[in-house]
Amino acid sequence: MMGPLLSYWRVRLVTDIVKIYGIKNCDTVKKALKFLSSKSFSYEFIDYREHPISRDLFEEMEQGVGLDVLINKRSTSFRALSDEEKQNINYELVTKYPTLIKRPVLIQNGNVMVGFSDKQYSEFFL
């Protein structure tokens, strides 16, 4: 039996809109959007190539998961950076090379999650 607080949390979780940041042609982003649609969750997708992220949003992402999780160190963009740039990832680099950010980035109620797996999303939403 759920108490009133837990019931309230579940209702808020389902009704507050989810924001998904990524690149529209990314297969992992497509899987995440398909998952959300299949579960009838409302979401807003923001392609950060078309709509670069703000400094505040970058800081929210960084504080939510840390740069080690947020930055895609396997990306071609990351490997092309100089050693100095790799050690000093910042907002300016991310706006210059948006594919440095792992995809997708999901934000809801101040919670930040990076990447996608069915298990990860199921645990987050259920």
Per-region residue spans from a language model:
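Short, Lys/Arg-enriched N-terminal segments with co-localized hydrophobic residues
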Residues: 1-14
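Local sequence-structure signature of Cys/Sec-based thiol-disulfide redox active-site neighborhoods
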Residues: 14-34, 44-48
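Short phosphate-binding/catalytic loops that engage adenosine nucleotides
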Residues: 41
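Thiol/selenol-based redox catalytic cores and closely related redox-interacting motifs
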Residues: 48-126
